[in-house]
């Protein structure tokens, strides 16, 4: 925040020549590597850039960073969906039982179960939500790992 508030006052770090002494030394050391044959000669190999990818690396990288996580997500979201489905059915059956008992007390004829549709609606909503999450993830990342 100080750098943003007082950007003009940073000139005092410069020496007389106007260069950043410590920064120049750091940049020169970072660009020099001891295994280069001649530091000051232009690199001729830059024109012949090898863009081939090691097959083993490509497969293992794709597996570790995409396919295995997708498999884990599918298994996890399937389990979440099944647990949610069981919970929704339990709650719906309790709601139906309470509604049924209340309707039988208030009138002579008992009303039919109507919350079964609501239960199915809740299940499909959970399924749609999980499908959208998985679908967006796969659609965004699959082209990168196929190409």
From Swiss-Prot:
Residues 13-55 are extracellular. Glycans are attached at residue 54. InterPro entries: GPCR_Rhodpsn, GPCR_Rhodpsn_7TM. GO terms for molecular function: G protein-coupled receptor activity. Pfam families: 7tm_1. The keyword Manganese does not apply. Residues 79-128 are cytoplasmic. One of its GO terms (cellular component) is presynaptic membrane. SUPFAM superfamilies: Family A G protein-coupled receptor-like. The chain crosses the membrane at residues 1-12, 56-78, 129-147. It is a multi-pass membrane protein. Gene3D superfamilies: Rhodopsin 7-helix transmembrane proteins. It is found in: Cell membrane. The keyword Magnesium does not apply. Keywords: Cell membrane, G-protein coupled receptor, Glycoprotein, Membrane, Receptor, Transducer, Transmembrane, Transmembrane helix. It comes from the Eukaryota. Belongs to the G-protein coupled receptor 1 family. Dopamine receptor whose activity is mediated by G proteins which activate adenylyl cyclase. This is D(1B) dopamine receptor. It comes from Macaca mulatta (Rhesus macaque).
């Amino acid at each position: 925040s100080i750098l943003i508030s007082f950007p003009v006052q940073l000139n005092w770090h410069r020496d007389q020549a106007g260069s950043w002494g410590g920064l120049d030394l750091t940049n020169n050391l970072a660009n020099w590597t001891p295994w280069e044959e001649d530091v000051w000669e232009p690199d001729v190999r830059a024109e012949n850039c090898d863009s081939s990818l090691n097959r083993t690396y490509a497969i293992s990288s794709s597996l570790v960073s995409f396919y295995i996580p997708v498999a884990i997500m599918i298994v996890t979201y399937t389990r979440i969906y099944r647990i949610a489905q069981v919970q929704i059915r339990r709650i719906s059956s309790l709601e139906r039982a309470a509604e049924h008992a209340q309707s039988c007390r208030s009138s002579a004829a008992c009303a039919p179960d109507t919350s079964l549709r609501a239960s199915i609606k809740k299940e499909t909503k959970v399924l749609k939500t999980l499908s959208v999450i998985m679908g967006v993830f796969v659609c965004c990342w699959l082209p990168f790992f196929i190409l």
